[in-house]
Amino acid sequence: MKDLTKKSILKLKQSSTLVINEKCKNLINKGKKVYQFGFGQSPFPVPEKIVSTLKNNAHRKEYLPIQGLAQLRESISKNLKKKIGINYPKENIVITPGSKEAMLLLHVAFNGEIILSAPSWVSYEPQAIIGRNKVHWIQTSRENNWFPTAQQLEKKIKSIKKKNLILIINSPNNPSGTICKNLKELAKVAKKYNLIVLSDEIYTDLTFCNKYESISQHYPERTCISGGLSKWCGAGGWRVGFFAVPNELSELLENVKTLASESYSTV
């Protein structure tokens, strides 16, 4: 039989980072020495406190609330408040099986279009395609630290007819490894045009400086934050992420929760 798959899905391929990781494992199993630079897997062990806590709760088997454990959401809320000074109450936080799932649900729920910078993480565009959201690219350069300038962002916004737009910011960035130094300027443009910002902050605790800056500090009212254990904790295979949403975007939060309730049981 033919035509079993939607045309939009036929355009997609398996995530290149995961495919390359499997190829590397196969080569290693064959005795080959592989230097792998394409996968964000920490070589360090998961902190012992987290390991022991997981062991102590291994007997827990009940279904959980759609948004995840209240105690965990409260801890994330307090941590965000401590690090960036912005209040995302636990009621506005959803625990997901990895931050990747959180972003996918946002793409599926969102009725609009996406602004991405090039280069960017390999899964942003495929997720937008799954959500049937058109992607608009901004080409970046080394001179601007591989992030769009405020002028580039404003020019791109003016060229788009759709009113509902999400700007995705990933700082520290995958794949460049750089930190965005013009968040305040980008936030000013985003606010001017009423953009939604998705701040992918999965790498925020992996920097050579103690300063942690989030675009939400400059535009809290319409900035969503995604994060998780995968990078700083080295627990990519555990699949624990979160999605924090400001009060102004409660409609999106409710619909992400609806999608979550029909797809997985959370932590």
Which role does the model predict for each range below?
Residues 140-210:
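Active-site phosphate-binding strand-loop segment of PLP-dependent enzymes
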Residues 87-93, 112-113, 221-222:
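Short acidic capping loops at alpha-helix termini that bridge into adjacent secondary structure
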Residues 20, 37, 54, 76, ...:
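Generic structural signal for small/hydrophobic residues in well-ordered secondary structure
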Residues 116, 137, 197-199, 225:
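Hydrophobic residues in well-ordered beta-strands that form the structural core
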Residues 109-128:
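Conserved PLP-anchoring active-site segment centered on the Schiff-base-forming lysine
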Residues 3-97:
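N-terminal small-domain helix-loop-helix segment of the aminotransferase-like
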Residues 27-30, 131, 192-193:
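Helix C-cap/helix->beta junction micro-motif
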Residues 224-267:
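PLP-dependent aminotransferase class I/II
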